[in-house]
UniProtKB/Swiss-Prot annotation:
The active site is at residue 517. One of its GO terms (cellular component) is cytosol. GO terms for biological process: isoleucine biosynthetic process; L-valine biosynthetic process. [2Fe-2S] cluster binds at residues 122, 195. It catalyses: (2R)-2,3-dihydroxy-3-methylbutanoate = 3-methyl-2-oxobutanoate + H2O; (2R,3R)-2,3-dihydroxy-3-methylpentanoate = (S)-3-methyl-2-oxopentanoate + H2O. Its cofactor is [2Fe-2S] cluster; Mg(2+). Binds 1 [2Fe-2S] cluster per subunit. This cluster acts as a Lewis acid cofactor. This is Dihydroxy-acid dehydratase. The modification N6-carboxylysine is found at residue 124. Functions in the biosynthesis of branched-chain amino acids. Catalyzes the dehydration of (2R,3R)-2,3-dihydroxy-3-methylpentanoate (2,3-dihydroxy-3-methylvalerate) into 2-oxo-3-methylpentanoate (2-oxo-3-methylvalerate) and of (2R)-2,3-dihydroxy-3-methylbutanoate (2,3-dihydroxyisovalerate) into 2-oxo-3-methylbutanoate (2-oxoisovalerate), the penultimate precursor to L-isoleucine and L-valine, respectively.
């Protein structure tokens, strides 16, 4: 029987000093035999997805104590990718994932916590906490802050649904007046919560449902809706039960590594492909699998992408559909339900809240349950009132979207496309693979060939696009923006948004060893591995080289002979694998430390102490 970890600091004569310090935090004699649960919060006033979390940690803490545990809250950092976008701040986004994972490990191990509730929400926070949970392998429940409501605006007599990306595209479009841009800006992000489309934050929070580490509704219930409070309340009670199951009954099904098995990772990736999730999820799923010592690789993702269809299209792939619409259609449990009906899911994986994922789907999929409670839960609607307050409204849809032929969620028999929403491409330009969000690619450019326009930084590409130097048919290549070369693997939301604003969203391709925001759509291919800084072929591309992209056949090729590539490689080896132009970029010691050990994207950009 495993001993409670906390007894290292709460039991025995020699721990009198530690107990004295625990008492100074408010603990009493009766508390020293209880499980100590870490409430890992990520409140910050910098990030709309986290601005409402201040009191939610203590809400969970009260429920933990009511269930017989001792709750101790601490915070991690949280970077807002949208605010950090387009300047040196984006260099810090991906490295912050590792810092978050490390900080959770440091706090939990230093204080011998028995279990934890992770209160996350935005882009790198959920992945960082997920990595920590699998690294520590103690009972864990995830509960996120929830998505924000979609923006709504009336322009020239027409109502539009909006999100962050619409504001960015409008600002770069010379045809839109300053007044209209202001109106869009003020309406795009109306409430607290993670940005309203199927961007990285919401994608990752949805994947925790498929992994079995969060409660149903975690990925889709709006941050503002009163129904979301139940998830926090239940998480507090559930984590005490999980801790007791493991430490008092030796039930390993309460542990993250048992729950998030290879089969569970396959479920999560199948969901990601079916819902057209952010390409960043691939990076984070690979990193989480690495922490959990799960043999899950790009090859597994490639295999899944060839058999899982696209069952849902949400912004940015479909601009008028947002997370509130996914929730109305039954949320993640209903997408999983359609995958289950198609034989594309591992039903027997355990979860934190049900014996198996199959049991959970049978209860929570709105097309197969008779529960009025479940159906009412998925009728939770946006309130339409700007606010930064959690659980502040109780609006309900009049009905649910159960149309699996033409609705927001489709059946396997009526998919948006037979090919899934994500694909792995390989070829001489990306020997170890790269990722494209096919759900956001227009059918007319699934096969694309064009001359390379080569840029050694995101900044250079942005200047060229805004100066109308990129033309229809071009393939924009942005290199030395990978985990090591950036460093930090910046998101390329501005280049893709500006291509859209110039009317080139369906006429150009963009290839990079960097990554893309979850808000990106178009023929945007990222995570090219190996990256340029690690000697990848992308570092050998020259201006005007022809590049061939074939998504249906999963290939990406540089139309240059092997002999010529060998000559270029020998020349580059002599020069060194770094940008030829001087980049005005403040790479601090902290960023250099990350770059020193960062691997390419095909390994999740995790640190490898043998990388140097």
């Amino acid at each position: 029987m495993p001993a409670y970890r906390s007894r290292t600091t709460t039991h025995g004569r020699n721990m009198a000093g530690a107990r004295g310090l625990w008492r100074a935090t408010g603990m009493k004699d009766s508390d020293f035999g209880k499980p100590i649960i870490a409430v890992v919060n990520s409140f910050t006033q910098f990030v709309p997805g986290h601005v409402h979390l201040k009191d939610l940690g203590q809400l969970v803490a009260r429920e933990i104590e009511a269930a017989g545990g001792v709750a101790k809250e601490f915070n991690t950092i949280a970077v807002d990718d949208g605010i950090a976008m387009g300047h040196d701040g984006m260099l810090y986004s991906l490295p912050s994932r590792e810092l978050i994972a490390d900080s959770v490990e440091y706090m939990v191990n230093a204080h011998c916590a028995d279990a934890m509730v992770c209160i996350s929400n935005c882009d790198k926070i959920t992945p960082g906490m997920l990595m920590a949970s699998l690294r520590l392998n103690i009972p864990t429940v995830f509960v996120s802050g929830g998505p924000m409501e979609a923006g709504k605006v009336v322009l020239h007599g027409k109502t539009h649904a909006l999100d962050l990306v619409d504001a960015m595209v409008a600002a770069a479009d010379d045809k839109i007046s300053d007044e209209d841009v202001k109106v869009i800006e003020r309406s795009a992000c109306p409430t607290c919560g993670s940005c309203s489309g199927m961007f990285t934050a919401n994608s990752m929070n949805c994947l925790t449902e498929a992994l079995g580490l969060s409660l149903p509704g975690n990925g889709s219930t709006l941050a503002t809706h009163a129904d979301r409070k139940r998830l926090f309340v239940e998480a507090g009670h559930l984590i005490v039960d999980l801790a007791r199951r493991y430490y008092e009954q030796d039930d390993v099904k309460a542990l993250p590594r048992t729950i998030a098995s290879k089969q569970a990772f396959e479920n999560a990736m199948a969901l990601d492909i079916a819902m057209g999730g952010s390409t960043n999820t691939v990076l984070h799923i690979l990193a989480a699998a690495h922490e959990g010592e799960v043999d899950f690789t790009m090859a597994d993702i490639d295999a899944l992408s060839r058999r899982v269809p696209c069952l849902s299209k949400v912004a940015p792939a479909k601009s008028d559909v947002h997370m509130e619409d996914v929730h109305r259609a039954g949320g993640i449990m209903s997408i999983l339900g359609e995958l289950d009906k198609g034989g594309l899911l591992n039903r027997d994986c355990p979860t934190v809240h049900a014996e198996t994922l199959g049991d959970a789907i049978d209860r929570w999929d709105i097309t197969r349950t008779n529960s009025d409670t479940v159906r009412n839960f998925y009728r939770a609607a946006p309130g339409g009132i700007p606010t930064q307050v959690a659980f502040s409204q109780e609006a309900r849809w009049d009905d649910l979207d159960t149309d699996r032929q033409n609705g927001v969620i489709r059946s396997v028999e009526h998919p948006f496309s037979k090919d899934g929403g994500l694909a792995v491409l390989k070829g001489n330009l990306a020997i170890d693979g790269c990722i494209v969000k096919t759900a956001g690619v227009d059918e007319s450019i699934l096969k694309f060939s064009g001359p390379a326009r080569v840029f050694e930084s995101q900044d250079g590409s942005v200047k060229a696009i805004l100066a109308n130097e990129v033309k229809a048919g071009d393939v924009v290549v942005i290199r030395y923006e990978g985990p090591k070369g950036g460093p930090g693997m910046q998101e390329m939301l501005y280049p893709t948004s500006y291509l859209k604003s110039k009317g080139l969203g369906k006429a150009c391709a963009l290839i990079t060893d960097g990554r893309f925001s979850g808000g990106t759509s178009g023929l945007s291919i990222g995570h090219v591995s190996p990256e340029a800084a690690n000697g990848g072929t992308i570092g050998l591309v020259r201006e005007g080289d022809m590049i061939d992209i074939d998504i249906p056949n999963r290939t990406i090729s540089l139309r240059v002979s092997e002999a010529e590539l060998a000559d270029r490689r020998a020349e580059q080896d002599g020069k060194g694998w770094h940008p030829t132009e001087v980049r005005k970029r403040n790479v601090t010691t902290a960023l250099k430390a990350y770059a020193a050990f960062a691997t390419s994207a095909d390994r999740g950009a995790v640190r490898d102490l043998n990388a140097r």
